[in-house]
Amino acid sequence: MKRFRIVAPLALMSLALAACETTGPGSGNAPIIAHTPAGIEGSWVDPNGIASSFNGGIFETRTTDTNEKLAEGNYLYLSPQLVEINMRSIVRGTTSKVNCALVSPTQLNCTSSAGSRFSLTRRNAG
């Protein structure tokens, strides 16, 4: 009887550990969820097909057909959802400030210091 008291809890513990092992990731039971980057890091596109990238504080805008750089600058977070971009237009030779609000994980609404408004949509990775 004493032996049963030792073996039974060990057997139950083994079953519990085995259950954890077989229901973890990779067992086929967990759904795969696409990960959207946090904040504005990554690639975005405007309705005209102009691509903008935000990477480690560096901002760039390029054409999608020839990859010509149109603007460059830097950005900083004013809050988790609000970003200030200081940019220089290579095409126009001007500098401006743009404030952008992350209204959803895939949409960025922006207003330039001149008052023009535009939206950017996050590009799919891959």
UniProtKB/Swiss-Prot annotation:
Keywords linked to the UniProt accession: Cell outer membrane, Lipoprotein, Membrane, Palmitate, Signal
Signal peptide residue numbers: 1-19
Bilayer topology annotation: Lipid-anchor
PROSITE patterns the UniProt entry points to: PROKAR_LIPOPROTEIN
Domain of life of the native organism: Bacteria
Protein family membership: Belongs to the rhizobiaceae omp10 lipoprotein family.
Something else known: Elicits an immune response in B.melitensis-infected sheep but not in B.abortus-infected cattle.
Organism per entry: Brucella melitensis biotype 1 (strain ATCC 23456 / CCUG 17765 / NCTC 10094 / 16M)
Lipidated residue numbers (N-palmitoyl cysteine): 20
Subcellular location: Cell outer membrane
Lipidation (S-diacylglycerol cysteine): 20
This protein's name: Outer membrane lipoprotein omp10
InterPro entries reported in the protein's UniProt record: Omp10-like
GO cellular component terms given for this protein: cell outer membrane
